[in-house]
Amino acid sequence: MSLSIELEFKQDVLLVRLTGELDHHTAEELRSKITEAIEKESISHLILNLQHLTFMDSSGLGVILGRYKQVHNNGGEMVVCAISPAIERLFNMSGLFKIIRFEPNEANALQKLGVA
């Protein structure tokens, strides 16, 4: 299966909706799309909606951690929302939830970043 990447801009927030599998085959495409969008659109914050993400491996974790650092170094925040139980376990095991905020849905994530 492949990965579908949907980007939406709301003020200074980049909202990324992922559908499918985030693995070593698709991680580079996600990295480049998010990095390009952050740089071109003056994005401060990043929301990842993982509701329809069915699989993620360590390559996906690496991309997410790298984008967290990119946003954080620019004074912004990253929020992950609508995560499935399987992906949530991966986040917990990797320790990503210690540094990346989790919200139950997009509306909550946008509200926490001041966009409603």
UniProtKB/Swiss-Prot annotation:
Q: Which gene encodes it?
A: spoIIAA
Q: Which NCBIfam families match?
A: ant_ant_sig, spore_II_AA
Stretches assigned to the STAS domain:
3-113
Q: What is this protein called?
A: Anti-sigma F factor antagonist
Query: Listed GO molecular functions?
Result: anti-sigma factor antagonist activity; antisigma factor binding
* Record family assignment: Belongs to the anti-sigma-factor antagonist family.
> What function does this protein fulfil?
In the phosphorylated form it could act as an anti-anti-sigma factor that counteracts SpoIIAB and thus releases sigma f from inhibition.
Residues where Phosphoserine occurs?
Answer: 58
Explain the post-translational modification. Answer: Phosphorylated by SpoIIAB on a serine residue.
Q: Which Pfam families match?
A: STAS
Protein's GO biological process: sporulation resulting in formation of a cellular spore
Q: Which UniProt keywords apply?
A: Phosphoprotein, Sporulation
Q: Which PROSITE patterns match?
A: STAS
| SUPFAM superfamilies attached to this UniProt entry | SpoIIaa-like
Report the domain of life of the source organism.
Bacteria
List the InterPro entries hit by this protein, alphabetically.
Anti-sigma_ant, Anti-sigma_F_ant, STAS_dom, STAS_dom_sf
Please tell me the species this chain comes from.
Priestia megaterium (Bacillus megaterium)
